[in-house]
Amino acid sequence: MSLDLALDVQYATTSDYLPSEEQLALWVKTAIGNSMKQAELTIRIVDARESQMLNGTYRGKDKPTNVLSFPFEAPPEIELPLLGDLVICASVVENEAREQDKTLEAHWAHMVVHGCLHLLGYDHIEDEEAEEMESLETQLIESLGFTDPYKEQ
């Protein structure tokens, strides 16, 4: 089954490397897999200031973060393909990639997959949930040709 994806990409910052809409769509489709027939999703790529503001407002943490996931929650009787929004901070992703000795492309792919899994309801608060989510992330990232994102962490 092929996913019918409506992806809105908003580039609200500049950087030496930002993934293309085609790359982002591939990573989203890989993460969503057969979970949905149709999906609508917005990915907003932001600077540290906007990330810090959103992270403070929605998570109570006064610092920028790599990815924020905002799932769309419709009433149960209404079926819509709206998955939600991802907000990804380019500078945090770049710094983490450098610190973890990963390519930018590999870390961007990981952040998109990670964020999409949150939108699908996965979480990593409890150890058991974290193991399940990390295992799935690893499978998906490796299917894209990248190495295990949690190796050596």
Swiss-Prot record:
It is found in: Cytoplasm. SUPFAM superfamilies: Metalloproteases ('zincins'), catalytic domain. Binds 1 zinc ion. Keywords: Cytoplasm, Endonuclease, Hydrolase, Metal-binding, Nuclease, Ribosome biogenesis, rRNA processing, Zinc. InterPro entries: MetalPrtase_cat_dom_sf_prd, YbeY, YbeY_CS. PROSITE patterns: UPF0054. It comes from Shewanella oneidensis (strain ATCC 700550 / JCM 31522 / CIP 106686 / LMG 19005 / NCIMB 14063 / MR-1). Belongs to the endoribonuclease YbeY family. Its cofactor is Zn(2+). GO terms for molecular function: metalloendopeptidase activity; RNA endonuclease activity; zinc ion binding. This is Endoribonuclease YbeY. GO terms for cellular component: cytoplasm. Its EC number is 3.1.-.-. Zn(2+) binds at residues 114, 118, 124. Pfam families: YbeY (PF02130). Single strand-specific metallo-endoribonuclease involved in late-stage 70S ribosome quality control and in maturation of the 3' terminus of the 16S rRNA. GO terms for biological process: rRNA processing.
